[in-house]
Amino acid sequence: EASVNGPEMIKRGEIDEATIGSDILDSWLSDDTTKDMVSMDRPNTNYTYFYMFNFMPFSHEFSNWSVEGMDAEYEPENWAKAINNTNFRKSFLYGINNSVTLAVKAPEGYDNYKLNTITPPSFCANADGVDYLKCGDLANITEFFDEAKAKEYRDAAIPELTAAGVTFPIKVQMPYNPSSTDWDKQCQVFKQQLEGVLNDGFDFIDIIITAGPSDSFLSSVRRNGKFAFLLCNWGADYSDPQTETDPFYQAEGARGSRYAFLRTGVEDGFITGDTADAVMNYMKAIEAAVEITDDINARYDAFANAEASLINNALVVPMGMSIPAYIATRLNYWEGQYASTGFSNKRL
């Protein structure tokens, strides 16, 4: 009941906390009886969000479970050809304006939450006190959003995709969890923004927003391969860049529960050509970085180079940090335990 009627229940003193969605935030802030109850939740700085492409859109058997893959109505065969094209993926990397979607959840200010990397700033520093994001090739990564460049990649991709037998517009299934506050609104804004860029002058993509189940969303959607493009997140478990590789890295022959199954895609022939080369270069770079245990600067540079290659090859698209919800609360979270990684910051 609290998840549905929380704002009214906290007014009546029946619960201690309720999330205030963007649709009612303005009215709560302008009402003298409620404005002092509203604040942003304590930031969860170890969680970052990024968009994942589904490189394995077909049914697939693993040793411990089966992946169903995308439904036929979303044309998985067409998507599989498109996703193997680097220029196609880079049109997304440069075409997405994260400011627009972040503004849905942070109408009072979103700049501090936008990321061009997977690892957040101030996550860790090397032996010289240099922030990890200033190490190696990550130091060269800046804002990606560039409409002109996105269209250049799109225009380069069109003849390549046509030669591969791709039909346009390319269907892009983008699910959301209806129980997550404002995720549906973010998807609508995302669709309008990206299609506005990439469909300017050519019917390039058709983003199809689908509502997943409120319960068991990850098992039903992400782990089941029922998406083309999906907003995912990851929370660091410890303060070393190796923890940020968990959603992407797979050991040789591994069938672990990873977000993208990049190595599986190469090993089983879903991912080919330049994309396969980029995937395997990343895997080898991570394996080399893990072995560096006696030189923190060299270790961080190696991980930074690997993360930069993952992003620059558009195998993943960074989005932002976890944006604290606006809440009405009778609790003081700032009095609770805190750690920048793990779950100590969730204890009261």
Protein language model regions, located:
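Ligand/substrate-recognition segments at binding pockets and active sites
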Residues: 1, 12, 140-148, 155-236, ...
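Short, solvent-exposed loop/beta-turn-alpha elements that line the ligand-binding surface or hinge
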Residues: 1, 30-43, 51-82, 124-148, ...
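Ligand-site clamp/hinge motif
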Residues: 1-28
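Sec/Tat-exported extracytoplasmic proteins
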Residues: 14, 29-33, 55, 95-109, ...
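Paired acidic/hydrophobic, glycine-rich loop segments that form the ligand-binding mouth/hinge
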Residues: 16-22, 228-232, 318
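A ligand-binding cleft/hinge motif common to bilobed small-molecule-binding domains
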Residues: 22-35, 236-241
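Append "and occasionally in soluble cytosolic enzymes with long acidic Gly/Pro-rich linkers
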Residues: 79-198, 305
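Bilobed periplasmic-binding protein-like "clamshell/Venus-flytrap" ligand-binding domains
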Residues: 102-105, 156-178, 279-330
